């Protein structure tokens, strides 16, 4: 009986240590993610909140989704957008585009349904158009209202 009690106590200690380790890993991960988000916010500010990417997106959203030829004056915003993204760490580019999308949704536009899906597809593929890594930035459930 004493052997069972000792074994049970040892098992409880191991479980408690495992829980403490998992908790520490969660806290460490959360702190690292918060520090990374802060670094990305600073990079966004240095890159003017991706203002040219927003202008490019705005122009794209004003055009028909079936238009095949780009409008005159649109490509400079695209190349400036690429320069702004290139000025950010690779690890912050997608987070920066997500921040830009949330800002556009909250401050400038109120896209819904298909318009929101189109806007997200455009933003997801901006790195690819710029030939930057990562080539695609999934927006998925990270944007409110989608």
UniProtKB/Swiss-Prot annotation:
Q: Is the keyword Disulfide bond assigned to this protein?
A: yes
Q: Which residues form the signal peptide?
A: 1-22
Under the heading Gene3D superfamilies, the entry gives: Plant lipid-transfer and hydrophobic proteins
Q: Name one Pfam family in it.
A: Tryp_alpha_amyl
Write down the SMART domains for this protein, in alphabetical order: AAI
Q: Cite the propeptide residues by number.
A: 23-36, 65-69, 143-146
The outcome of changing residue 91 to E is: In variant 1A
Please list the disulfide bridges: 40-92, 53-81, 82-130, 94-137
Keyword terms of this UniProt record: Allergen, Disulfide bond, Pyrrolidone carboxylic acid, Seed storage protein, Signal, Storage protein
* GO MF, one example: nutrient reservoir activity
Q: Which residues in this protein are found as Pyrrolidone carboxylic acid?
A: 37
Q: Which domain of life is it from?
A: Eukaryota
Q: Does the keyword Oxidoreductase apply?
A: no
Q: Where are the transmembrane segments?
A: none
Q: Which family is it part of?
A: Belongs to the 2S seed storage albumins family.
> What does it do?
This is a 2S seed storage protein.
Q: How does it assemble?
A: The mature protein consists of a small and a large chain linked by disulfide bonds.
Protein's name according to its UniProt entry: 2S sulfur-rich seed storage protein 1
